[in-house]
Amino acid sequence: MTTPQFGSQRSDDDNWDIVSSVGYTALLVAGWRALHAVSPRPLVRDDYAKTFIAASGDPYLTGVLANPGTSEDELAFPRLYGAQTRFFDDFFDAAGAAGIRQAVIIAAGLDSRAYRLEWPPATTVFEVDLAKVLEFKARVLGEQGAVPKARRVEVAADLRADWSRPLEAAGFDVESPSAWSVEGLLPYLTDEAQHALFTRISGLSAPGSRIAIGALGSRLDHDQLHALEESHPGVDVSGNVDFSALTYEPQSDPAEWLAAHGWVVDPVRNTLDLQAGYGMTPPEVDVKIDGFMRSQYITAAR
């Protein structure tokens, strides 16, 4: 097994669109959501996901969606990301029920929650990501005639820089409680950038605010993923994406950071916990995947 070269395809000022580098991973996850939507008994249906794949023209993902698998192995990653999607959906639903009317989706990518969820009246959903990614999403959804179910505000910004000023300039109210999601981002940040991200979120979060985070206790090791595909032939993880080269070594624990900076952190769960909570019995392949990814699903409040 070769030593993974974490972050070897990254630089401090790298940029991307939806079909390159880190941007492609958002497209890949949209593909998994689309596959989950057509699987038996899906936890959530994101019917916009397949639209993004079609618009991208990506041959790998369009091919997979044209012939979706049905075995436990083939549905492994769609199943795991179905659970993750449901986790964040439930988080925002609960925040809205508690009276929070500002939602901030960090690294929004191809997230369609502004269009899918039933938001309370007067809710604003801020989507923060690179301009090229937001432009692709807006174009595709606009061509579909999709209408958001809340006031949707795009904030074009690099999350490694000071994105708090553009967010406030877009109308974010620092005096009102907010609900934050950080989904699928942390592996692509250095430890320093992760600290800066949470520091900015904390500085913008009024009392009553909430946060939900999806994190990994290990980085996505390309060799481990390849070995998984060999031991479970139906698993097709990545379309040959080298996640090791796009991600960084794990250092800080997000739950520990939040607890040390004024947040009350709920018990941390993993993907298997989420599945059990949704009445599912995780098959062997799911247990194996979470064994090396060491997923963390974190919620906290101020």
From Swiss-Prot:
Molecular function (GO) terms listed?
Answer: methyltransferase activity
Q: Where, by residue number, does S-adenosyl-L-methionine bind?
A: D129, D158, L159
For this UniProt record, the keywords arranged alphabetically read as follows: Methyltransferase, S-adenosyl-L-methionine, Transferase
InterPro entries from the xrefs? Ppm1/Ppm2/Tcmp (IPR007213), SAM-dependent_MTases_sf (IPR029063), SAM_mthyl_Trfase_ML2640-like (IPR011610)
Report which superkingdom the organism of origin falls in. Bacteria
Q: A GO term (biological process) for this protein?
A: methylation
Q: Which Pfam families match?
A: LCM
Q: Which of the seven top EC classes does this enzyme belong to?
A: transferase
The record ties this protein, via Gene3D superfamilies, to: Vaccinia Virus protein VP39
**Which E.C. number(s) belong to this protein?**
2.1.1.-
S-adenosyl-L-methionine found in the keyword field: yes
* NCBIfam families associated with the record: mthyl_TIGR00027 (TIGR00027)
Protein family per UniProt = Belongs to the UPF0677 family.
Q: In UniProt terms, what function does this protein have?
A: Exhibits S-adenosyl-L-methionine-dependent methyltransferase activity.
Protein name in the entry = Putative S-adenosyl-L-methionine-dependent methyltransferase MAP_1622c
Organism field: Mycolicibacterium paratuberculosis (strain ATCC BAA-968 / K-10)
